[in-house]
Amino acid sequence: MQLPDRLRRLIGQDASWSTDHEGASGTALRVVSGSKVFYVKHGPLASAEHLRLRWLHGRVPVPEVVAFEDDVLVIADVGAPSSEAAAPADIGAVLGRTLRMLHELPVTECPFDGGLPAVLERARANIRDGLVDPDDFDADHIGLTPEMVYERLLATRPHVADLVVAHGDYTPSNVLVPASGEPVVIDVPALGVADRYRDLAIVHRDLSEDHGPTAWEEFLSAYALVDHIDEERMYYYRLLDELL
C-alpha cells in the first residue's frame, strides 16, 4: 500500500504491518509503531467508513479517526476484543443495548442512504464483478446461484420499511467490548438509513447459530424496540446478505 507522505511520517518508518489480527481482511492492516497500534484501510470503503465515523463521533462509541488522506484511513486501536471473541455470558443483552443505541439515532440527521434500492444495486454489482461465493451461503440457500438469489430478492421485495440508522453488517465481530465503558461499534462503511430488519436479520442469524435461542431472547429484551418479529423481512434481509 502506498501511503501519502504525511501518513507515513505519522505512522513511522519502523512500523510493523500485519494482516494477522481478529477479523483480518485484505482491506485492513494492523500497524504497530512503538507503543501505538493503528488499523489502516484504503479504497472506496475506507472513504465511506471515514465519513460515517466522523458523523457517528459523539453519537455512539466508535474508534478514533487518527488521519485520512487519499482514500487511506488510519484508525486508533480500541484495545478491546470483539463480542464474538470475548463471548460474554450476556452477549445477547450487550448486542441488544448497543443496537438500540444506534437505532434510536434520529434518521433525519443521518446523511447516508442504506435503503433497499442502493443495496440491491450493490448486490447486482457484486454478482457482476464475481464477488459472491455461493459456497459461503447459509445452509438453506445451498444450491442457489447468486443470480437466483438476486431474482428472488426482486420478486419478494418488502412493501414496508421501518427506517432507522442501520449498521449494515451488525455481527458480534463488529462490536468491541472494553473492560469498562460502553461497547464500541466498528466496520461501518455500510451504515445508513435502512429498514431495521437489515440489522436484526444478521444479528439473529449469528446469535442463534453460535449462542442459541436464549441469547436471541436476551437480545430482544435489551433491544426493546419491536413488539413482534416480522419473519418474512427477517428472511428477506438474511437472503440479501448472501450477496453483500
Language-model regions: role of each:
Residues D162-V165, P178-I229:
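Active-site Asp-x-Gly
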Residues L225-L244:
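Charged phosphate-binding loop/patch that engages nucleotide di/tri-phosphates or the phosphate backbone
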Residues R8-S33:
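ATP-binding glycine-rich phosphate-binding loop
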Residues S173-V177:
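Hydrophobic residue at the +6 position relative to the catalytic HRD Asp in the kinase catalytic loop
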